[in-house]
Amino acid sequence: MISYLKGIVAGIQNVGSNRVILTLEVNGMGYDLQIPQRLAKQLPTTGDLVQIFTHYQVREEIPLLYGFSSPAERDLFRHLLSVSGVGAASAIALLDTLELPDLVQAIIAANVQILIQAPGVGKKIADRICLELKAKLIEWRKSAGFFVATEGPAPGILEEVQMTLFALGYTAHEVSHALHVVSEDIGLPKDAYVEDWIKQAIAHLSSSEQVSH
């Protein structure tokens, strides 16, 4: 089994609307790997040396390679594939929608509303992911070297805050980051009013938009 490949970035191309293919030159051979869009944005320009952690799969007798930025990201991809009804496209969509710790936290907390923000992931699949992976990920996160963050609104408040922000057009990644900032930097209590969480999160998101412009 191929654990990782270390080689030169020969090219990155978008195939269709949601597939990104990295061509990696290793010892004179070119390997095509499907990678998350998030990884594609992190990779250096063509010609630079990189290390990509891989998952090998044979589908309909066609060998496929998937590439990831870390062993933890690859292992979580494999956990997602173990869930009935979850294919590579859905697993990569989840990895692209949320940062690794946020995705693990959402699954362990059975936060279906944030999981269904990933393209192609419906409520039924999200429920199944939470049901089948919660116990596994509680153990796995320890060996992976990180713990699920405890900041953010209390569970009873979180879903209402998230749904309000999603309705305003913010992405799952933007919402998770904003709630982290509001909790860690501003110090808003977990049991503060829903309106306070929403107000502070929007203030942060609005200021971030102004900076980006």
UniProtKB/Swiss-Prot annotation:
Residues 1-69 are annotated as: Domain I. The lineage of its organism: Bacteria, Bacillati, Cyanobacteriota, Cyanophyceae, Nostocales. It comes from the Bacteria. It is found in: Cytoplasm. It comes from Trichormus variabilis (strain ATCC 29413 / PCC 7937). Has three domains with a flexible linker between the domains II and III and assumes an 'L' shape. Domain III is highly mobile and contacts RuvB. It holds the Pfam family RuvA_N. The RuvA-RuvB-RuvC complex processes Holliday junction (HJ) DNA during genetic recombination and DNA repair, while the RuvA-RuvB complex plays an important role in the rescue of blocked DNA replication forks via replication fork reversal (RFR). RuvA specifically binds to HJ cruciform DNA, conferring on it an open structure. The RuvB hexamer acts as an ATP-dependent pump, pulling dsDNA into and through the RuvAB complex. HJ branch migration allows RuvC to scan DNA until it finds its consensus sequence, where it cleaves and resolves the cruciform DNA. One of its GO terms (molecular function) is four-way junction helicase activity. Residues 158-213 are annotated as: Domain III. Belongs to the RuvA family. Homotetramer. Forms an RuvA(8)-RuvB(12)-Holliday junction (HJ) complex. HJ DNA is sandwiched between 2 RuvA tetramers; dsDNA enters through RuvA and exits via RuvB. An RuvB hexamer assembles on each DNA strand where it exits the tetramer. Each RuvB hexamer is contacted by two RuvA subunits (via domain III) on 2 adjacent RuvB subunits; this complex drives branch migration. In the full resolvosome a probable DNA-RuvA(4)-RuvB(12)-RuvC(2) complex forms which resolves the HJ. Residues 149-158 are annotated as: Flexible linker. One of its GO terms (cellular component) is cytoplasm. Keywords: Cytoplasm, DNA damage, DNA recombination, DNA repair, DNA-binding. InterPro entries: DNA_helicase_Holl-junc_RuvA_I, NA-bd_OB-fold, RuvA, RuvA_2-like, RuvA_C, RuvA_C_sf. GO terms for biological process: DNA recombination; DNA repair. This is Holliday junction branch migration complex subunit RuvA. Residues 70-148 are annotated as: Domain II.
